[in-house]
């Protein structure tokens, strides 16, 4: 398991549907090591702290494995790491095998899995598609948030190691299904 890309971005104003909105969903890959702090990565911020960021959403990761699905699903788009607003594009970590509460060593930082991503309208803005949130939720490819247990640094190609598994064994995918799955059987 490893980090494929480290991506950061700062808030900026974007015109969308005739409105000017602040967003930091536009992340760009960076070279070299980046410090992971308690609430974010150096060079990265969230635009709306009422719904983004905070201790339980300090770092957002998205599996590189999902990009091939999206290339097939949306063939007219060109994809680059960070496209989903993730700080870490990872390899070998998936929603169905990561549990809420699992602790991982990512580079020199210790992170804990906290929750799946629950996208806001800015994902639709990022992709220029009104149906993007619906597609994202239906795909089951949510990615996952981490809290920072021990700050450190991370770079593309940093190793990822599972330090401990939460004994409750509730996966990120389980939580995403509870939030976004069909409500008749939940």
Predicted regions and their residues:
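Short loop/turn positions at the edges of beta-strands in beta-sheet-rich folds
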Residues: 92-94, 140, 150
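Loop/turn positions that initiate beta-strands
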Residues: 101, 151, 155-158
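Electropositive, beta-rich accessory/interaction domains or terminal extensions
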Residues: 1-122, 131, 167-186
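Short amphipathic alpha-helix initiation/capping segments at coil-to-helix junctions
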Residues: 138, 150-153, 168
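Short hydrophobic beta/alpha edge segments that flank linear recognition/processing sites
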Residues: 160-164
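Active-site glycine-rich loop that binds ribose-phosphate moieties when present
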Residues: 127-134, 138-148
């Amino acid at each position: 398991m490893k980090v494929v890309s480290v991506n950061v971005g700062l808030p900026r104003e974007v015109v969308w549907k005739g409105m000017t909105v602040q967003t930091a969903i536009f992340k760009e890959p960076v070279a070299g090591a980046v410090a992971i702090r308690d609430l974010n990565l150096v060079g990265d911020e969230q635009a709306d702290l009422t719904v983004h960021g905070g201790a339980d959403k300090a770092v957002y990761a998205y599996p590189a494995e999902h990009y091939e699905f999206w290339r097939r699903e949306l063939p007219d788009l060109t994809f680059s790491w960070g496209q989903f607003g993730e700080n870490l594009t990872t390899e070998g970590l998936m929603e169905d095998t990561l549990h809420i509460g699992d602790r991982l060593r990512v580079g020199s930082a210790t992170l804990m899995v906290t929750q799946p991503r629950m996208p806001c309208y800015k994902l639709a803005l990022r992709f220029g598609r009104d149906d993007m949130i619906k597609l994202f939720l239906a795909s089951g490819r949510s990615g996952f948030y981490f809290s920072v247990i021990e700050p450190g640094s991370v770079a593309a190609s940093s190793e990822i190691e599972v330090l401990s598994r939460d004994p409750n064994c509730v996966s990120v995918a389980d939580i995403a299904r509870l939030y976004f799955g069909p409500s008749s059987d939940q």
